[in-house]
Structures are given as structure tokens and as C-alpha cells.
């Protein structure tokens, strides 16, 4: 509820927890209320209901992805032909590959921007908040759920990305466990 209320005055928040299960549970509740969530982390550790909200799935379903996939395929094919061509042919192919790489980078940036701009909640585990996709991103508010079970060192990873931190959880729960 606190996350939902905070979204009335903030454009985006970061929501973290120690476990994937907790992150998925919170994310599901928000999705059920119509909040756009972008789930960051290893898709193999995300529950089935939240898979379609993972960065990887949303990236692949973006309208610009087929063009990006085609460009990447052209880059691979051009690279293969380059190894077999003469010097003058390789020079032309290098120029083509450079243009293709530039366009691929533009598309990747566009897709990333679209995905992050459309999400009101970025959800990840505390450790996954250090994912390269979140590098350089700041959030007005960070919610840490299951804070009583979170390892302090893991909390600091996410805390560095936020201006304000809200800790939530039952202090009567079990202490942090190290696996």
C-alpha cells in the first residue's frame, strides 16, 4: 500500500527485497493493481507469472526488437564474410559494420529508455539492484521489503541508488540467513 501511495507523487520507485520470492510477491500485487512493473534480475529465478514483466522478455517484445535482431544478424554475417574477403572488400565491410553497430546501439538505447520510462516500479533483489541496467540510475524512493531478513551489506547496494529509503518487514521474523 505504501508503494502504491508513493506513486501518486513520484514518477518511479525502486522496490527490493532479499529474496526473489518476496520481490515477485510484491510485484504481483502491484501488477494486479495496474502498476507498470519492470522486473530486473535473472529470469530463471523469477516466478512464471512475473516472467512477462522481466527486462529480458519486455526487451524482446519491444516493437524495435525485430529490427535490432536483424541488424545483429547482419553484423554476424558481415563478420563471417570479412574473414574471407580481400583487403579492399574488408575495408568496405568494416565501414558497413561500423554503421550497423551504431544503429544497433541507437536501438538498444531507445528500447532501454522506453522500458524504463514506461515502468513506475523497478523491482529487483537487493543484490540485483547492482545490475548494469541500473548503473547511473537514481530513484527518489527505495522500498526494502523483508528488511528484518535482509543482510545489511546487500541493503547498501540498493541504498546507494535512492534519495530516500523505506524499510518494511516484521522484526519478529527470522534473522538473515546465509546460504
Where are these regions (language model features)?
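ASCE P-loop NTPase motor cores of helicases and related translocases
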Residues: 1-112, 121
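Conserved helicase motor core of SF1/SF2 NTP-dependent helicases
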Residues: 8-11, 19, 33, 113, ...
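Short, Asp-centered acidic motifs that coordinate Mg2+ and/or phosphate
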Residues: 120-121, 141
